[in-house]
A protein has these predicted regions:
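Single conserved hydrophobic/aromatic residue that forms the stacking wall/gate
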Residues: 1-6, 10, 353
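Long, contiguous bundles of hydrophobic transmembrane helices that form the permeation core
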Residues: 3, 175-287, 291
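Hydrophobic mid-bilayer segments of alpha-helices in multi-pass membrane transport proteins
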Residues: 8-19, 24-43, 53-64, 232-244, ...
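Membrane-embedded alpha-helical segments and adjacent helix-loop junctions characteristic
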Residues: 16, 20-22, 32-41, 46-130, ...
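Alpha-helical transmembrane segments and, especially, the helix-loop junctions at the ends
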Residues: 63, 101-118, 132-197, 351-352
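Membrane-helix interface motif
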Residues: 151-162, 249-257, 316, 320-324
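Membrane-interfacial helical/loop segments at transmembrane boundaries in membrane proteins
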Residues: 161-162, 255-264, 329-335
Length: 354
């Protein structure tokens, strides 16, 4: 199985499964990962590795808490605050919009919470005669950048799980991702301020304006029904996130157990699962929210799609790598040792291609 020809077949099979899964949408990416894993196992005889159970359970716990916060009105409350901020400072919408969507995703751990703010951003920009593409473009990018910086996002949780055993803490990850993404978002916002012509100078916009093609109907975000419950849910969720960051940054805060004569510290995966499940339960109890309602929002199905995607794709990818580790090591070891920065560029380009 170490031959170059068979290795190329593996690569094509893995890429094909990913591409087809991406086209199917929803849980398609994950289930196609299962198909790819089946081919690797039953056709090519590769031994499956252990599925990423810890990563999946961490994501499920975080999504449970975020879903309960949404059911209690927490996300609606955050959107209402964002609307007030943007309408109060319309001339700075290009700078404020990405910061708002970044903060939303950073707190909730998912970019889906930023969708509700986008219509408000577009309306405020149009009313201020600012090209809507300027704040909208960078706002969407900012929400995705925040995924890599959020301590409870699927990406960060997955990375923390993959780096378990390498003496890398959650704080080590955040002290790189948070400054890097914030700086990138701010630079992108400044650049976006010069994208395209001003609306008063844009002939196409002026033409459509004269033809009355623009809808003057004002977008209004509905008031939160139970403001107290909404505020409590957001506060509980933020406190849970803060506890996770503290536990991840200071190992001495974690519980330790004597196992076979050795002191073993509780891993971050278990801590994240315990804290977030507890936060979800506290939100439901304190705000008197129906647990069924938590599964009917937009956050829960999106999060479960991420779990299935990681289940299939990560399992298939790990099996592929372990089955071809000798060949892969020989082919890239020399290059990585001489030019480690080139490996980072190669990974970046390969992800864009996929």
């Amino acid at each position: 199985y170490a031959s170059r020809g068979l290795g190329d077949v593996y690569k094509r099979q893995v890429l094909t499964a990913i591409i087809i899964g991406a086209r199917l949408g929803g849980i398609g990416l994950g289930v196609m990962g299962g198909v790819g894993l089946g081919i690797l196992t039953f056709v090519f005889g590769l031994q499956p590795t252990a599925p990423p159970i810890d990563v999946m359970l961490m994501i499920a716990a975080v999504i449970s808490a975020a879903s309960c916060m949404q059911a209690a009105g927490g996300l609606d409350y955050m959107v209402k605050l964002a609307e007030h901020l943007l309408r109060k400072n319309p001339s700075h919408v290009t700078l404020l919009s990405p910061l708002v969507t970044y903060l939303f995703t950073f707190i909730a751990g998912t970019g889906h919470v930023a969708y509700s703010v986008l219509p408000v951003i577009a309306e405020v920009a149009t009313e201020t005669k600012i090209r809507p593409e300027r704040p909208l473009g960078i706002a969407v990018i900012a929400s995705q950048q925040a995924i890599t910086a959020s301590p409870i996002s699927a990406a960060t949780v997955a990375l923390l799980g993959l780096l378990a055993g390498f003496d890398i803490t959650l704080f080590d990850i955040l002290k790189i991702t948070i400054p890097a993404t914030i700086i990138g978002v701010l630079v992108g916002a400044l650049f976006s301020m010069k994208v395209g012509k001003e609306l008063i100078e844009d002939p196409e916009y002026q033409k459509r304006l004269k033809e009355g093609l623009f809808n003057d109907k004002k977008i209004e975000i509905k008031d939160v029904k139970n403001k107290r419950s909404a505020m409590l849910s957001v506060l509980i969720f933020i406190l849970a996130t803060a506890f996770i960051v503290l536990f991840g940054s200071f190992e001495g805060m974690r519980p330790s157990f004597l196992i076979d004569g050795e002191i073993v510290t509780l891993g971050m995966s278990s801590i994240i699962e315990i804290v977030m499940l507890s936060a979800a339960a506290i939100i439901l109890i304190v705000t008197k929210t129906d647990g069924i309602k938590a599964t009917q929002g937009s956050v829960f199905p999106a999060g479960m799609q991420a779990v299935i995607a990681i289940f299939g794709i990560a399992w298939m990818g790990d099996t592929f790598l372990q089955g071809n580790m000798a060949q892969l090591t020989l082919s890239i070891e020399g290059i990585v040792r001489q030019m480690p920065w080139l490996f980072g560029i190669a990974l970046f380009l390969s992800l864009i291609h996929i």
